[in-house]
Design a protein with these regions (language model features):
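Cell wall/extracellular polymer interaction/catalysis modules
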Residues: 1-59, 64
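Exported/periplasmic cell-wall-interacting domains
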Residues: 2-16, 54-57, 66-139
Length: 139
């Protein structure tokens, strides 16, 4: 019998359940489903590939939620309204300093690894998600 480090939301053909976030790094899009209903489908800007800040891939769980927050790192302190970390210091948040999302922005002008999201879309996610919800990040 295997020992599981984590338990799925259920043990059948859909073990992440019907509420989850998908982040598609190649297409720079994020979708959020709640109870099987699509609530958000938005362009995003993820980690800057050229600077070595690629957003980590894998299956994660939402670690926490904070509103507002100040994101701090070497040489920056960025206030955000919605902060939803899922992999250490990497998370989903609004980015008031951006006017465009999607496309190839992430290659040369991406984030430090986080998923920069339009504020209105980040608000929808924040107001409908809870800690522990699966976050699936893939290329």
């Amino acid at each position: 019998q295997p020992a599981y480090a984590y338990s799925g939301l259920c043990r059948d053909t859909n073990d992440i359940g019907n509420t989850y976030v998908e982040i598609d790094l190649t297409n720079q899009r994020m979708v959020f489903y709640k109870d099987g209903q699509l609530l958000v489908d938005t362009p995003v800007v993820t980690g800057c590939v050229r600077k070595g800040h690629a957003t980590p891939t894998g299956c994660f769980a939402l670690d926490a939620m904070r509103s507002p927050a100040v994101l701090k790192g070497p040489g920056y302190a960025s206030p955000v309204t919605y902060w939803m970390p899922f992999s250490g210091g990497v998370g989903i948040h609004d980015a008031s300093w951006r006017s465009q999302y999607g496309g190839q922005i992430y290659i040369t002008n991406g984030s430090h690894g986080c998923v920069n999201t339009p504020k209105d879309q980040a608000a929808i996610i924040y107001n409908n998600i809870s800690v522990g919800v699966p976050i699936v990040v893939y290329e």
